[in-house]
UniProtKB/Swiss-Prot annotation:
Top-level taxonomic group: Bacteria
UniProt signal peptide: none
Pathway(s) this gene product operates in, as recorded in its UniProt entry: Cell wall biogenesis; peptidoglycan biosynthesis
One GO MF term: UDP-N-acetylmuramate-L-alanine ligase activity
Free-text function comment from the UniProt entry: Cell wall formation.
Protein name according to UniProt: UDP-N-acetylmuramate--L-alanine ligase
Chemical reaction(s) catalysed: UDP-N-acetyl-alpha-D-muramate + L-alanine + ATP = UDP-N-acetyl-alpha-D-muramoyl-L-alanine + ADP + phosphate + H(+)
Main localization (coarse): cytoplasm
A cellular component term, taken from the record's GO annotations: cytoplasm
EC number: 6.3.2.8
Annotated ATP binding sites: 112-118
Location(s) in or outside the cell: Cytoplasm
Keywords: ATP-binding, Cell cycle, Cell division, Cell shape, Cell wall biogenesis/degradation, Cytoplasm, Ligase, Nucleotide-binding, Peptidoglycan synthesis
Length: 464
């Protein structure tokens, strides 16, 4: 690519999937520019690395670019996309650029509706601890590295494989994980679960004959793909058909302990004891997937165990913001009913005796409409729920699909719920809703993330 491409322009460069790729490209020596509707903290690091960042989308921004990379949120009607088409500048999706980067490495792609970011981070951390110095591109900030991405000197590139727009089908990894397959982004697949399943099957069938598919066989849809694969498969989970099986899971502080048993012929042997610095059974599964990859590339068990014990998580994935006046605040990206349920369950396991309050910002009108009843049932596990209005993520509003409607449906089932439409004024109002000693979970993939920095001012103290 270097002989033909020097200037790369990225539309939506502040997005979680874009800025990691931008950072790797900058470190490779490419000239990178980009635009975002709300550049800010998400693009400061890129500016420091030499990227030119434009606020807003204008046709003039693409001048001089050899290629334009767009995120999945950018429509064809975007003025920069239209200008690039008129100037005959190639326009590609972010996954196509990721696939180009992966061509020069041994690709490890992490797919699944839920758990991609954490699993990718775990894999990158273990490979780094094992001295393999991987390149990684993650949809969240790996706390230990302080970044979403890094250019390593080793042979492996670890990245998330995004199914939201089916662009993961551009990737050609040598190893892949599928954590789960769940109903989300169904507009991409014509509303058909069969089409969604088929896309994951195509993704796995792109693996070479010498590769490895690491699959969570606790998930029936994932397990059902195995008969159609020619690539070697490593099964993981809690179930009896797993090759790597987690047993004896216990809570340890804000984390967990568990034993890993490995199938040898027709029996299991106790292989590894793990201390994991992040909570929840879902994260035990994510760790099992990472262990499977690490064992394939030859990392010793002792190194795997140490890396998992040292792992401190990813930004906005059960991120402990702090404790203020006896109130513990945890921030999480969860925005799908299943993610919400898993995060609430994790919080309950860590703080079983404390009141649990969830402040949730629904994300996308289409998702809220499609999974309306599931949102109600998943949020019912909290003691109290505070709802904001829906974060559109660029979608047009749908009649009758509002945060207020969701709150009313919850109240009709006897749930304790409060609707706060304006997120800008929400922090003080949320503070007033919290009982003494509560745990507050702020959940959502939209602008609710901005609340984390406001709590010291709201509570009038620094976190303890």
């Amino acid at each position: 690519m270097r002989n033909w491409v020097r200037q790369i322009h990225m539309v939506g460069i502040g997005g979680s999937g874009m800025r990691g790729i931008a950072e790797v490209l900058l470190n490779l020596g490419y000239a990178v520019s980009g635009s975002d509707l709300r550049p800010g903290n998400s693009t400061l690091r890129l500016t420091d690395l030499g990227a030119r960042i434009f606020s807003g989308h204008e046709a003039a921004n693409v001048r001089g670019a050899d290629v334009v990379v767009i995120s999945s949120a950018i429509p064809e009607s975007n003025p920069e996309v239209q200008a690039a088409r008129e100037l005959r500048i190639p326009v590609i999706r972010r996954a196509e650029m990721l696939a180009e980067l992966m061509r020069f490495k041994q690709g490890i792609a992490i797919a699944g509706t839920h758990g991609k970011t954490t699993t990718t981070s775990l894999v990158a951390s273990i490979l780094g601890a094992g001295g393999l110095d991987p390149t990684f591109v993650i949809g969240g900030r790996l706390k230990s590295a302080g970044t979403h991405a890094a250019l390593g000197s080793g042979e492996y590139l670890v990245a998330e494989a995004d199914e939201s727009d089916a662009s993961f089908l551009y990737l050609s990894p040598v190893m892949a994980v599928v954590t789960n397959i769940d109903a989300d982004h169904m507009e991409t697949y014509g509303g058909s679960l069969d089409n969604l399943r088929g896309a994951f099957l195509q993704f796995l069938q792109r693996l070479p004959f010498y590769g490895l598919a690491v699959l969570c066989t606790d998930e029936a849809v994932v397990a059902g793909l195995i008969p159609e694969l020619r690539t070697p498969v490593l099964r993981y989970g809690f179930g009896a058909d797993a090759d790597l099986q987690a047993r004896d899971v216990t809570v340890q502080g804000i984390g967990s302990r568990f034993a890993v048993w490995r199938r040898v012929d027709s029996d299991y042997v106790h292989w590894l004891d793990v201390e994991l610095g992040i909570p929840g059974r879902h994260n035990v599964l994510n760790a099992l997937a990472a262990i499977g990859i690490a064992s394939k590339v030859g990392i010793p068990e002792s190194t795997i165990a140490t890396a998992l014990a040292d792992f401190r998580g990813v930004g906005r994935r059960f991120e402990l913001v702090g404790t203020f006046d006896g109130i513990t605040v945890v921030d999480d990206y969860g925005h799908h009913p299943r993610e919400i349920a898993a995060t609430i369950a994790a919080a309950r396991s860590v703080w079983p005796e404390r009141p649990l309050v969830v402040a949730f910002q629904p994300h996308r009108y289409s998702r809220t409409q499609a999974l309306f009843a599931d949102f109600v049932s998943s949020l019912a596990a909290a003691d109290r729920v505070i709802l904001t209005d829906i974060y559109s993520a660029g979608e047009k509003a749908l009649p009758g699909v509002t945060g207020r409607a969701l709150a009313e449906a919850m109240a009709a089932q006897g749930m304790s719920v409060r609707f706060l439409p304006d997120l800008l004024t929400a922090p003080q109002q949320i503070r007033a809703e919290l009982p003494a000693g509560a745990v507050l979970l702020t959940l959502g993939a939209g602008s609710i993330a901005s609340l984390a920095a406001q709590w010291p001012q709201v509570f009038g103290e620094d976190p303890s």
